[in-house]
Amino acid sequence: MFGSATANPPAQRDLPSSDSDSPTPDAQPPYLLEISHISKGFPGVIALNDVQLRVRPGSVLALMGENGAGKSTLMKIIAGIYQPDSGEIRLRGKPIRFETPLSALQAGIAMIHQELNLMPFMSIAENIWIGREQLNGLHMVDHREMHRCTTELLERLRIRLDPEDLVGNLSIAERQMVEIAKAVSYNSDVLIMDEPTSAITETEVAHLFSIINDLRAQGKGIIYITHKMNEVFEIADEVAVFRDGAYIGLQRAESMDGDSLITMMVGRELTQLFPEREKPPGEVLLSVSNLCLNGIFKDVSFDLRAGEILGIAGLMGSGRTNVAETLFGITPSDSGEVRFDGTTVHIADPHQAIELGFALLTEDRKLTGLFPCLSVMENMEMAVLANYAGNGFVQQKALRALCEDMCKKLRVKTPSLEQCIDTLSGGNQQKALLARWLMTNPRLLILDEPTRGIDVGAKAEIYRLISLLASEGMAVIMISSELPEVLGMSDRVMVMHEGEMMGILDRGEATQEKVMHLASGHKVH
């Protein structure tokens, strides 16, 4: 019965069988979870090589590493999705092996995936208790009891949602909370959170962290996977680092700083994360005057020079992405003027924008960028395919040569151009999408969250490419939610708040405090 899962903790769980004896009742193991000498290989790849990890009760362990470091593989082993080739897992001091994700859940290990696994046309209560529904005396689902238990669970977590709300009507952050509630409903002692803040606002992050603090106080062990170093130092007690399938080390978060963490992750010092550009910007290439999209943003005005990087900062919902989509013709403006290279232009659709020399790398590469079932080459050639086709034939040899050249220039790591792009790391996917647009020879490059969900080493590569393109005379608009990124890369920073342009700061005067002040709706005096 699921009712007891929320009100009173159940009796000691029956763990999957193990050949080893359990610890004595009086012995309290110091760790909730211990990983020892785990190895895992796939055809042609050693994903994990003799790694270790341990999670203390009542603590948050941040798991850091570049994409491909082995973090996800280890978490899938812990959650029962993969089986290790060798090594041992101990839960509460007892050796254990999970054959299925269900056996891991029943033992007290829950994983909240980055790609949320909820049913959009079912209610919150139905999603939380799916497969564990309470039945009444007629052996029918007892919706009243399910509602009661869900209400109690949400109140305990301070999540203000109606159990009867359809999940499909919730925001991403609210769905994240439902996933956490579902994990807690199993009385899980170990919770694995994979990039939980990748698509939520700062206010929602604060709420998430308060819930994590509550879970920590209840003695839960939390494994927190993230690429955001500021979150590590805010929420984590300890930090474990993986690199190239190997365990590098574990340290107290308070004993580390950003530089030492980066060095552990990439195996070298990134002395200059944001490259310097000596060449000054050229003449004005793009001039935007009083651009408006009814109900979304109004009176946006700015100039952009060739070779200049203009950062756009603001909180989620401020209108940053909408401005980019309007410039690219996805949502044509209702009023205002756009001049490109001295000529007034009316951009009605993306095809016209591309012909003018505009390129847009969208905010969500999985939703609006990638064709996940197609190859690297098929994804890269998408924007120029029409230029290499005629009379029913495609110039495959010329396209392949172009794609190979772009892969070399942008350092896209892939076994072959025929490789399914969905198998590449986030950083290499992003570079492949950037290559798609560079093949069109754009003069204006609009980047919306160009480093979202990629590791620090791949970020350095993206920054290098953006800086190189600007040095070659390309005008760049870069939208980002990461203030250090905006401040480190931009020549000027435009700040938006609820559809209004609050101001533009030169590089020398732009600080995190000033940008946040403007982004919150306050003018800088």
From Swiss-Prot:
PROSITE patterns for the chain: ABC_TRANSPORTER_1, ABC_TRANSPORTER_2, MGLA, RBSA
SUPFAM superfamilies xref list: P-loop containing nucleoside triphosphate hydrolases (SSF52540)
Function as written in the Swiss-Prot or TrEMBL entry: Part of an ABC transporter complex involved in carbohydrate import. Could be involved in ribose, galactose and/or methyl galactoside import. Responsible for energy coupling to the transport system.
Sequence ranges of Low complexity compositional bias: 14-25
Domain of life: Bacteria
CDD domains reported in the protein's UniProt record: ABC_Carb_Monos_I, ABC_Carb_Monos_II
Name of this chain's protein: Putative ribose/galactose/methyl galactoside import ATP-binding protein
Localisation per UniProt entry: Cell inner membrane
Organism: Pseudomonas savastanoi pv. phaseolicola (strain 1448A / Race 6) (Pseudomonas syringae pv. phaseolicola (strain 1448A / Race 6))
